[in-house]
Amino acid sequence: MVLNKRRIKDGNTIRALISLVFVAALVPHLTFAQDKIIATYTLPDTPIKQFQNALLPGSVANDRKVLLGSIGSDLWHGPKDPRDEFWMITDRGPNGQIAVDGKNRRTFWVPEFDPTIVRVKTEGKAIKILEAIPIVGQSGKPVTGLPNLKDVDEAPYNYSAQELLPLNPNGLDTEGLVRTTAGDFWIGEEYSPSILHVDRTGKVIKRYIPEGLPLEGTDYPVAKVLPVIYGKRKINRGFEGIALSGDEKTLYLVLQSPLLNPDRKTGEASRNSRVLVFDIPSEKVTAEYVYRFDVSKEFDPNPKNTPDEMKLSGVIAMNPTTLLVLERTDLVAKLYSVDLSQATNILGSKWNDAKTAPTLEALADPATAGVRVLPKTLVLDLSSIKGMPEKIEGIALLDQNTLAVSNDNDFDSEESKYDAEGNNIGKGKISQILMISLAKPLPLQQSAVAKISEPR
């Protein structure tokens, strides 16, 4: 480089050149704040038979060597909970699929398994279970995780798919979890889909299901108050996430996948899922919004990824109009902030009528039909953080700088592989809680921490 003699005599120019050289030398050594995992905790190996029989004596005769898992279906940290304690929940139990004559059959490794709420402590490198609450009906009998209705749910089979199991109207596929300051629980459930109210002992107080669903003979009260259109949910894709408002009067529920409306082909190709708002005092749905998924191949470039692999899981109520929503595939997970105040409330509209054509799920762009979807802002790309496991489902905020997440390991049994004795052959997938230090603090008000928003 040749410098002009006149300019090199300029003291300001010389100082600027020296500064540039100094900064260039520093760049390789500079570090920038990054989102990172600061602690990881793992659930120790515990046989299901040992775990459940301690709670419900004699309920499990053979667990087929399946270990307790899937407690990370959701993660709750209440405002008064110790920093190292969380509430978690299993799903319906270890299950899988086996093809018979070209058709998949839903298998249940341990049909007696009972969905359970657990209070845990992160200690050392382990998830320590402090308390376990099995979910039971009004009679005190376990609800189990078996499907409810013929032609509505999948038919249940035993581990080998050779024996048809009985349906159970009480059965629950529990997923989302919140806990009130009074100690009772609200749960998002996938079979109906339904909202479940459970007392502090695990007894079902009431189950809220879609209108028109022929669910009878349950061991607990049932209220048919949800929009009838929700009866078109894709099997195993019901209410995956649930959030609670700060005044504990409002629930927010996310539907894991678009409804199969009007049919399976349309639903599995759709990008339009739904968010439901439920008023606890009146026991009524008060609002409904459209959540639009990202384009699947842009979100997760995995060759096996299709629009049907896009899902919603955890959700946190930041304030009365803002939710933090976990959008994911099995491999990629991102947190988005969505604004309810800027979206169309479609409750009671033609989009809840099965006769409407085209359906909401069929719309390539809901805006062309006058529907404003929830505006999304990316908050955190979890999959960009080194060490993040697959299938993140639970999220909880400890403070504006710290996020806790949990994964669902599917009881390490989803491959449906078994040995000569009929025992599970797993891959060693584990259940974890991970603490994440956020590079950019979230602008939270104190009441938003731990999934709680400001009172209205």
Task: Report each predicted region and the residues it spans.
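N-terminal secretory signal peptides that target proteins for export/translocation
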Residues: 1-14
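Short, aromatic- and cysteine-enriched interfacial helices/patches
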Residues: 3, 30-32
